[in-house]
Structures are given as structure tokens and as C-alpha cells.
Amino acid sequence: MRGQAAAPGPIWILAPLLLLLLLLGRWARAASGADIGPGTEQCTTLVQGKFFGYFSAAAVFPANASRCSWTLRNPDPRRYTLYMKVAKAPAPCSGPGRVRTYQFDSFLESTRTYLGVESFDEVLRLCDPSAPLAFLQASKQFLQMQRQQPPQDGDLGPQGSGDDFSVEYLVVGNRNPSHAACQMLCRWLDACLAGSRSSHPCGIMQTPCACLGGEAGDTASSPLVPRGDVCLRDGVAGGPENCLTSLTQDRGGHGSAGGWKLWSLWGECTRDCGGGLQTRTRTCSPTLGVEGRGCEGVLEEGRLCNRKACGPTGRTSSRSQSLRSTDARRREEFGDELQQFGFPSPQTGDPAAEEWSPWSVCSSTCGEGWQTRTRFCVSSSYSTQCSGPLREQRLCNNSAVCPVHGAWDEWSPWSLCSSTCGRGFRDRTRTCRPPQFGGNPCEGPEKQTKFCNIALCPGRAVDGNWNEWSSWSTCSASCSQGRQQRTRECNGPSYGGAECQGHWVETRDCFLQQCPVDGKWQAWASWGSCSVTCGGGSQRRERVCSGPFFGGAACQGPQDEYRQCGAQRCPEPHEICDEDNFGAVVWKETPAGEVAAVRCPRNATGLILRRCELDEEGIAFWEPPTYIRCVSIDYRNIQMMTREHLAKAQRGLPGEGVSEVIQTLLEISQDGTSYSGDLLSTIDVLRNMTEIFRRAYYSPTPGDVQNFVQIISNLLAEENRDKWEEAQLMGPNAKELFRLVEDFVDVIGFRMKDLRDAYQVTDNLVLSIHKLPASGATDISFPMKGWRATGDWAKVPEDRVTVSKSVFSTGLAEADDSSVFVVGTVLYRNLGSFLALQRNTTVLNSKVISVTVKPPPRSLLTPLEIEFAHMYNGTTNQTCILWDETDGPSSSAPPQLGPWSWRGCRTVPLDALRTRCLCDRLSTFAILAQLSADATMDKVTVPSVTLIVGCGVSSLTLLMLVIIYVSVWRYIRSERSVILINFCLSIISSNALILIGQTQTRNKVVCTLVAAFLHFFFLSSFCWVLTEAWQSYMAVTGRLRSRLVRKRFLCLGWGLPALVVAISVGFTKAKGYSTMNYCWLSLEGGLLYAFVGPAAAVVLVNMVIGILVFNKLVSKDGITDKKLKERAGASLWSSCVVLPLLALTWMSAVLAVTDRRSALFQILFAVFDSLEGFVIVMVHCILRREVQDAVKCRVVDRQEEGNGDSGGSFQNGHAQLMTDFEKDVDLACRSVLNKDIAACRTATITGTFKRPSLPEEEKMKLAKGPPPTFNSLPANVSKLHLHGSPRYPGGPLPDFPNHSLTLKKDKAPKSSFIGDGDIFKKLDSELSRAQEKALDTSYVILPTATATLRPKPKEEPKYSINIDQMPQTRLIHLSMAPDASFPTRSPPAREPPGGAPPEVPPVQPPPPPPPPPPPQQPIPPPPSLEPAPPSLGDTGEPSAHPGPSSGAGTKNENVATLSVSSLERRKSRYAELDFEKIMHTRKRHQDMFQDLNRKLQHAAEKEKEVPGVDNKPEKQQTPNKRAWESLRKPHGTPAWVKKELEPLPPSPLELRSVEWEKAGATIPLVGQDIIDLQTEV
């Protein structure tokens, strides 16, 4: 039994030792040849073909290097698994770089991409010292640890203690792993699980080995039998954790409750050479609860050591010691074996054996224990071997009770993985049995955690991401400028993720030091000024040596040199240009033939040049200065920026910021150029841009192309004409423009991707680029079908180009299939006028067209067809010319053509306005024409004869109409006439602006103003037609109020068009007002609707109003007044005729202005415009009755003025203050009264004052009352005329001795004159008889105001007449009896509204007069009485008392020349007057006069309180009194009027005057009110 137990010992020892030595040998070889990987740096390590190894971080990742890596390659991921053990540093990481660990499948060197990357940073946690050991398991092709770059470049600094860690790696086969590899892997697993917890799970997920207590178990004897890759425990399959028994035992003997303790360390080798033996032991801990139960297995094991041979002289003596074993069975269990084999007991008599050692101390201080003793066998070469055991054991009893320590129960099964896919966690737990009898508690973890990785997550796309950049490489140049590079790797995408975006390499400039530079001469400077200006001298120039630098050699040669100068003769005084101050610059004296130069202004760089020349007589004179070398600061900056970008493009650097430069140049060029040098600078910038576009590092964008073309268009603007002419004088600079455009077409056609067709339309050129294959080419026409130009001038192109498809044939079949052609066509709008070919006899008579084909064809089998439209009228000998710089001067060609040539083109005239050119070369083409000897160059923009005739005829007819209306204005003044005058003015202004706009197309400011005003006057003409219709409608409906309506008419006629134009200009900022071809609204952008919309609205509203007026005219209850109906019909007919004709006129005007070349539109406009003028004159002048009557009256007035019949002969100059109406009627009536009063019939005078209509209430009153007996006459017919009339039937009135007028003063505000004498009784009776007789000669002269005679209350007892308030122009004819003998002093009568005959109530005979009042002291009459207020017709006549001061006897009128027929003629003017218009509204003026009355009452009360009224002077005239009020002379109180202070009872027949008829009232009548009198309905 002892031999059997000892036999397996050498096998168990030698096999692992041999495998371990083999691994150590491979490890040593790997360490010597570690740097065999593909890395490009020394700190890159690739390990492959090795199964075990070790390295430290200090060796693999040195402190002075970054981006170092260590890579372990798996021989075959399907057969092997990589394991790694990392011993972390005790301190946290402190170095600048972080070490990352990950596995990957492969690495693509071309894109620096890692495929299948999986990081282990979460598993290892190298910078976390809380877990000293970390383990991981990798199953992919490569396992790599890489040190990342620190955040900033520079010195990495010393490596901290926390950055030093050590790594062991192991490659284990998945099937049949070696025993030694399993031993090491099981120990790693034991340590991994022992140190695992929730925050640090174990990184070893599974092993192919059967692990048991940290060792590789024997599959034959172990109860844990591995089958394949699983271990069985109690017949249940599990993972590698089932192969472990105890993970908490330590070498100190504190472990589980029973079983073997851990092995001790290996002892010293028994021999120094020749092969020795090392041993180690372990102790057995008895199982709890099983008394006397031992452990199975050996207590001690050994291994060979120091097997190297000993020296020849060395004698070795050895102590042999065999492996011993013990049996854990009890003594009773041995039975007969003790007798058969013998129980270990002391042996004596063996000479070779030493004595037994003393028994050891009992192994247990409590309970049953063991004691051992040993002995050694000392043998020699001549002695025999020892017999018997060398070690003995015996039981020792102890009566003390042993403490029972806490014991762990079995581990629970591992939990499920925390994640269904990807990396997760698993854990298991165990419980501790509590200790007894003072035993120790359980030691070790209660829970273990490890990683689990069931399967990769499907369908979750992982995008690729870049790793950090590597450090910059060393500079490529040891001095001066060099380059550095750095790279980065991409962690490739997974499951369809996106690739890494960006570059994996970066380059930067580096500079280590300056290289030595030898000195180098710069170019010679320009020669200095000559020492003398003439007669021979010298001039000097010098050069500068640049360098040397950084130790280079100096320049060789002279620094300056001299030459002779000034050999010409000195000029005479007349050959020298004097000093001149021109253009704010002082030009010094300069000889003829030389050029003076001064600096450009502050906003530019360069020089201003001015040449001094000799005239034909040999006298020196200054030529105009040229600014060809002056370049503005902005253009100079753009030019320098472009040159910098070109330099970068030539070095192969990518172009950044080129688009911004083009955009900046576009913005600057839109503001115009200041100097001719700006043009050349811009061309230079565009040429450099073309070279940049040609480079492969920059591809032009569509925005760049558009900006490029727009810049060229800005250069060709009309504002730059003078600068182009100046540039042409210095040289043929136009050829640079042609070359620039040709190169641009070439570059764009072949550099832009996906370019098919491109059209660029600007204000001054059109660019068309076509890219097409040669195999499928067709004829190209310019413009192509479906042309949609945005510019007005190019919308209807007048010039055409046809390129035959035969041009694109190369003649080679192979080349035709792959050839691509680019065709560029450029139409220059006004370049021809810039090319300095205008002479006295020749001119470029077309636009300029350029045709380019790239690559250029060998020849043109079919010539180009180009059709040109002529630009000038009156030209002959149209000749096709082309731009050809290679064509030399020809004797047959005109010398002034310059680079233009007529060779290669054939001219085919089409018509008077078009010419076709057939050319066999590709170039730039135009038409050269000969001016007629008697013709001047007539630009199409000059107004044509048709427009001039149409506008002139219309304007003249309308102007004649205005003159007629002005001449008879006082007869026809009305709203309708005002509207017509404004309407005519708007049409006349529109015609003038049309002609002006045709000549100002080149002046942008004037053209914009013309377009805006033309827009305004066109709309105003429509609005005035609408105003006329509105006025007619208001008159028909009876809502016409003169002052208010006239203001609205003006707002509609002028205000509405002004508002529309102001809004349009404000919103568009005047863009669209005027174009390059005409001064009118642009057809683009919708601005034209600002005219069409309002005009259409006016037409629609006018139609609606016309329908309403027509409905009113034809209805039964419509207009009753015949004359008003006739006028309404005339106005409606005028609108129906004029409005359509006006719309047609302006439509044809817009077409004629926008399309100048269409003769049809111009003829239509001329016809419509002329017809419009005639129709307006016909409708509003010839066929209008009012105008006819007004003209007749005007002629009669002229005749009467020639005969002396004027109103200027009135008394006291009153005619100068009266209106025309008052003059005529007053003169007529006074003539009739003075000549024969019977001849003045009622029909003659009342017809003049007849109103066309009365309010309904007044009509009812008149219908109910008795027939009227009062008739109206003008208010200014003086009573003096009746007083002295020889045919007045009354005759002189007798004087009544008993009549008197009593001045009553009572509480009333004003005094009243009371008539109570016989004269007033006589007046009452005569008044009654006059009503009964109703003779034709009875009449009443009333003021033109609308006074009303109303019936008085019956209870009033007296007839009170207020003499003070009696209007001075009121006269009542009482009787025609021949026996009447009282004077013509009449009481006032009241007038019904509107001057109609009043309704007179019956007059009752007055009661007997009351007894006379007591006598009083007579009060002297005041020096003057307040004059009566002048009514509308009362112009202020003198007092009714004739006297020397009245002027009645001093001035006589000759009225015999005025007949009744003259009055009949004059009455027609005023037949339609409505005197109700004087006040507009009765209510308004009643309120106004009530206010005035209150003021007068207040003034009267103050006057009554102040004593000495008789001595007070007359009050000063108030400001609101009219001028004619000052002409009223004061009059005294009549002699037959008595003043009484006591109050008298009112008379029942008292006639009360209206408030505004009182003496103190003042009618606020202004000039506008007087005009309202003349208003027509």
C-alpha cells in the first residue's frame, strides 16, 4: 500500500515541471523576439506563436513615447482562447496617457480601420487599485493594449507609480488543453472568483479545464468528472465553477471545516548540483462531526531541482528522503492490516537509521489530535539501505472541547445573465453556518460575480468611431519649412453601422530652424530722374541685396549704376504746358511729349497720368487726365486676396474662401467703379478666378458661376461707359474681356459636375452654356426653345444664333462616341457702344455676340448663322464683322476697324431692320453700318414721330379745352368743370412724361422719376373719370354739398393715385420703376399690377355707378327736374364714351413704351390718344349747352364793355364788391326801374331766382297758402331808385303830422322802433289793398338770403316794426294809387326759404292806439346807428335817407343802353342757382347766429349800463367784418322818430326779423361760399 501510494508521486511532479519549463523556454524566446510585428514604431509589439508570456508596463509602454501598443495574436480563434492576468499598480494612474485594452478581428491598413472591435476597459479597470488583480478572456483574432496620446502634445513627463502594472497571458486550447495550462488557468480562475464582487466581476467566463481547488483535477479519481468542456458535480453538468472545491483556503491553515489545507512553499533543494529535490507539505483538517476522519492523499510532494552536473573534484553526500503518505482511516478500520504490514512503531537495531525524534506536540489543543515523530537514514556508499518508516503518527487525546468555527454552505447555482445579449453579469451566493464554542466566523465572500457573454446583440447597428490621434511625426525637413503627419484608427462599424467619417491622416507645416540663405540681388529699381531736363545729364538706379540670412554668403557685384540722359534739346517756352489746377490736383510744368503723374486720391492707389502735347500750331496743351492706373482700395484688396488663393491653388492646396471672395467682389461692383483702373483690376481678378477654377482642388459651384457672370454684367453697366472709353484709349482692353469669357466657358463646361445646360441672364449680357456629346448632337439655336429670361430686354430676343451639328463631328468613330463638346454663346447688350468704333461715318449697328466651342473644331463645314437687329435708324451698307486679332492690316479693310475684320463672314440683308451673317469661324460678331450723309444717328430710344404726333395732338386739343374753360370760368364754374380741368391736366402730363421717358432711359434717376410720375398720372386720369361719375350720382340722389364734396373729389382724383404710388415705391424701394429699355413699370416682379389693379377697379366701380344713374334716369319716381335730368344724362354719356377710350389709350401706351420696335402699338397709341382728345373736347365743350351759353355771354360782355356798359358806374364803387351775378341782375333791374317799371315783368326777373326744387315741407306750405303776391328781386336795388322814379304810381307821399316812431327800451337786449302814427296805419291799409289787387307791377325786393315770413301769433296786440334792424335793401311796394302822397319808406317784409314767394296771412285792422305816454325830455339822436348786416346780395348800400352824403345826386347812371333783351340773355347763366347753398344747412347757421346774437345782447347790456352813450365814438370794426361793411356810412335817426324809455306792449302785427338779419350780426361769408353760389346741380 505504501508503494502504491508513492508511485504516482514522480509522475505528478515531472509532468507539470516539464510543461512549465517548455512554456518558460518559449516565453524567453518571445521576449527576445517580441518586436516582430508590423508596427512602424519601436514601441509597437506584436506577439504571435506563443502560448504563455509576461511583460511589465514600464518595458512595453515607456514614459517618453506615446501611441505604444502591445498585440497578442490568436493562432486560430476557433481552436484557442486568450486569457490575461493583470496585476495592477497599488496607486491610481497618474501618467498623461491612458492604456486601453480591446480585441478585434482584423485591421485594414488602407483605411486604418479596426473590424469587430470590443473594448475590455470596463473589465480590467487598470486605474482602479481597489481590485489588485484583473482577468479577462478574449476569443477574437487579436488582443491589444494601447497607450493613448496625452491631451496635449509635448513632453510626456515622468511615469507615475500608478502606471506600472504587469501582465501575464495564456493561450489555451479549447479541446484537450495541456495539464500545465489547466493548472495555471485554474489558479487564475480561483483568484478571479475569489476577488470578484458586484463592482468588479470576474473576467473569466468559462474554461476548457476541469478545475478542483485551484488545481487541475484527475479525471479518473476526481468526483468532478469533466466531459468535454463541462464539469459534472453530482451528475449535473455545469461550468468551470463546478470544478472548484474551495476558493477560500489559505496557507495559514484557516480554511473549510474539513479537508486538506493549502500546500506550503517549496523548501530548499537538497543538493546544489547533480540533481536535488524540493518538497512541500500540507496539513489535513478533520471533518466536523466525523471523529477520527482523516484526509486522503499525500501530505508531502517533491520535485527535481539543481540538475546541473557537479564538478570533477566535488564529492557529494546526500540525504535521501522519500515521499511519505498518511491514511486518514481510524485505527479500528485497519484490522488485520496492522498485523500484516505492521503498525508504525519504533525500530531498533537498524545500524543505518538514526534515532527517532521526540513526539511532536499534539496537533489539536482540544479533542482528538495527532502526534508525529521522524528519523533520518544516514547511508554511505558502502552501507546498506535503511529499512522501516521514517515517520510515525499516533493519536493524542485531549479532554478540552474544541470550538466549532463558522462554516460555509454550498454555493448556490449561478444566476441567469443580466443581459440577453452582449456583455452581462452572473452571480452566486452562499450562507454561513454560525460558529460554536467560541469558534471563528466564516471568512471569504458571501457573493461572487463574473461577466457573461451569451451572444452578440442582433440588429443593433454600431457606427464606427475614431480613436484618438497619434502624435505628430518628425518634421520632413531639417530646416526651413517641412511637413508633419499624424494618424488615427477607426473602430469599424458593426451590424450595418455607418463608416467613420473624415480623414485618418492629418498634415501640418513644421519649422525647425532657418536654412542658411545666401544674399541675392533684387531687381533693379527704376531709373531716377535725370539730373537735367534737357541738354545732357545722367540718371542713377540702384538695387538692393536681399540677405544674407542665417550665415549665408553676401551678394556679389555693384549696388548702383549710371547712364546718360536728357540728350534732347531744351523745349521752347511755348512748348511747355504751364502749371494747371485741374481736378483738385496741381499739375506742374511739363514739356510737350511727356507725361505728368500725381498720386491718386485717398480712396485709391496708383498714379493719375496726364500728357502734355502740341497742337497743330505747335503750342503745348494739357490732355485730359487718365485714371487707368488708379485702383480703389476695395478693388486692390480683392485683387491681393485672389492672388493669394491662386498661389495656394498652384501649390496644390485646397481652395477655401474662394466663394466669399467672389461674393465680396460682386457686392463692390454693384456699387459701381470709381476709376477706369477698377475695370482692369476686376478683369485681373476674374482671370485669376478662372485659373483657380481650372485646378483640380476646387470645383466651382452654381453660385460661383452666377456671381461671375453678374460681375461681368456690372462692368458693362451704362455708368461705366466713360471708363471703358478711357481704357480703350490705353489699349485694346476689350480683347481681355473676350478671352476671359471664353476661358470661363471652357472651365465651367468641363469642371462643373452634372452640367448639362446653363443660362445666366443679367442686365447687360446673356450667357448660354451647353454640354453635349458629339454622337447625339443636334443643331443648337440661341435662344433655345422654352426660353424663360428674367430680364426685360432679353425676354423677347431680337438676335439669333444657329450652330449646326456638323461642327461637333471629329471624323473619328471612336472619338465621336466619347467626345464631349461645350458650346458657349454670349450676347452683350451694350458692349458695342464701348468699343470705340463710333466714327463720323461708321457705327456698330447691333449687339455683340460671341460663340465659343470647346474643344475647337478643325473647320466649320456649315457656317454659323447669326441674325442681328439694327440699333440705329438711317444707316446703310450693313457689314458683318468679327473679332480677329491675328488678321493683319488689309488695304481693302477700313483702317479704323482695328482688331475687327470683315473676312470670314458673308452679309445677307433680311429687311430694313435685320441682317443675317454667315461666318466660317468661331469668334465675336457684330454689324458695322455706314451713316447716311444727311442722317443723324437716331437711337431707337428717341421718341418716334408716331408718338410725338399722338401725344402732341392730344395735348393740344386738351390744352385748348382748358383755355376755353378758363376764359368763361365765372359762367361755368362748378364741380363738374373742376373735375374736367383736373382730368385734362392729368392726360397732358402723361403725354409729356411719355415723350420725356423715351429720351431718358440711360439716366437711371430721371427715368425712375418719370416712371413713378407716369404711374401717378395714369391712375389719376382713371380716378378723375370715376370722380365725374360720382359727382353725377351725388347730384342725382340730392346729396351734393359743395365744400365737403369738393374736398372728397380732390382726395379721390389726386390723393388715391398718390397713395398707390407711395405704397408701391415704399414696398419695392423704387426697384421696378424704370428698366434699361423704357421708363415705365417693370414687367417682372408683379409691380405692373399696381397699375392694372387700381385701373380695373376704377372701371368696375364706374360701371356700377353708371348703372345706378341710368336706373335713376329711367325710373318713374326719379329725377323730376328736366334740366338736372339732362345734365345727369350728359354726364353718364360722357363717362360711357371717355372711359373705354381712356383704357384703350393707356393700354396701347404701355405696349408702345415697352416694345419700342413695334410700329403697330405706336400707331394704335397715336390714334387712340388723338381720338381721346377730340372726344373730350366734343363732349365737354362743343356739345355742352352751358359752355355754349357761357361763350355767348362772354362775347356779349366783351361787346358791352366796349360800349361802356359796365358795373363800375355804381354808386360809391359798390360794383367792385359785388359778384358777377349781382352786377348783372342789379344793373338790369335798376335800368328797368329807372326807365319803365311796368316793363319789368314778373316772368323776367323771377325766372332768374327760381329754384329747381324745394324741400317737401316747403312745397306743402306753398300749396296750402294763398297765391303769392311777393316776387324776388336782387337785394341791392336801392330804394332811392323808387323814390325818384318818375313812373312810380304812388307819387310823392303826403306828410302825416300825427305819425311818430317811438324808441322803446325795455328788458329786451335791443331797442325797437314802434310805429304808431298815421303813416303806419296807412301802410297797413295799403298793404291789404296791394294783396287784393295783385298787380303785375307789384314786387318785393328782398335780400338773397333765405329769410322767412312766418305768421305771427294771434295774441300779439300790436304791429311792431324794428327800424334799427330793418335791412337797408328791403322794399315793399304797397300801392299803385295815383293819390298816394307818402314817401317811399317801407316797413320790412320777410322772405320765404330760397327766395320763393311767401305765404302772407291776412292782416287784421289794428286796434285803437293806446293813450300817448307822458312827455319826456327829448333825447338827442345818436351820431350813428349800427349798420344793418350785409346779406349775400347786400353789398352795403348807403342809408335810406337821401342827403348830400349819400352820393345819390352826385353820380348819375346812364342805363338807357341796357335793354330787356340783355336781361333775358343774362338770366340764362343763373337759371340753376340754388340760394339754399349759401348756408349749406339751416340748422348750422341758426346755431352760429344764435351765438352771435348772445354776444350782441351781452354787448348791448354793457352799453346800456355805461352813461353818456351819445358821446361815445363809433365802435371799431371787428376782424370778421367784410371789407364792404366799412363802406357803410352812418346815418342818423329820422326826425319823425320819438324815443321813449318806458316799455310798450307788443303789437300783434309785429314782424320779427331772423337772427342773422339783425344789425349786429355778421355773416361769415368767405370766398369759398361765394364760389358755392355758382355751383351747378
UniProtKB/Swiss-Prot annotation:
Glycans are attached at N877. GO terms for molecular function: G protein-coupled receptor activity; lipopolysaccharide binding; PDZ domain binding; phosphatidylserine binding; transmembrane signaling receptor activity. Residues 756-935 form the GAIN-B domain. Gene3D superfamilies: 1.25.40.610, 2.60.220.50, GPCR, family 2, extracellular hormone receptor domain, Rhodopsin 7-helix transmembrane proteins, Thrombospondin type-1 (TSP1) repeat. It is found in: Cell membrane; Cell projection, Phagocytic cup; Cell junction, Focal adhesion; Cell projection, Dendritic spine. GO terms for cellular component: dendrite; dendritic spine; extracellular space; focal adhesion; glutamatergic synapse; perinuclear region of cytoplasm; phagocytic cup; plasma membrane. The modification Phosphothreonine is found at T605. It holds the Pfam family HRM. Residues 34-944, 998-1004, 1070-1089, 1154-1162 are extracellular. Residues 313-325 have a biased composition (Low complexity). Residues 1359-1577 are annotated as: Involved in interaction with MAGI1. It is a multi-pass membrane protein. The TSP type-1 repeats in the extracellular domain mediate binding to phosphatidylserine. They are also required for bacterial recognition and binding to bacterial outer membrane lipopolysaccharide. Interacts with ELMO1 and DOCK1. When bound to ELMO1 and DOCK1, acts as a module to promote apoptotic cell engulfment. Interacts with MDM2; the interaction results in inhibition of MDM2-mediated ubiquitination and degradation of DLG4/PSD95. Interacts with PARD3 and TIAM1; the interaction is required for correct dendritic localization of PARD3 and TIAM1 and for dendritic spine formation. Interacts with MAGI1, MAGI3 and BAIAP2. Interacts with PHYHIP. Interacts with DLG4 (via PDZ domain). Vasculostatin-120: Interacts with CD36. Vasculostatin-120: Interacts with ARRB2. This is Adhesion G protein-coupled receptor B1. It comes from Rattus norvegicus. The gene is Adgrb1.
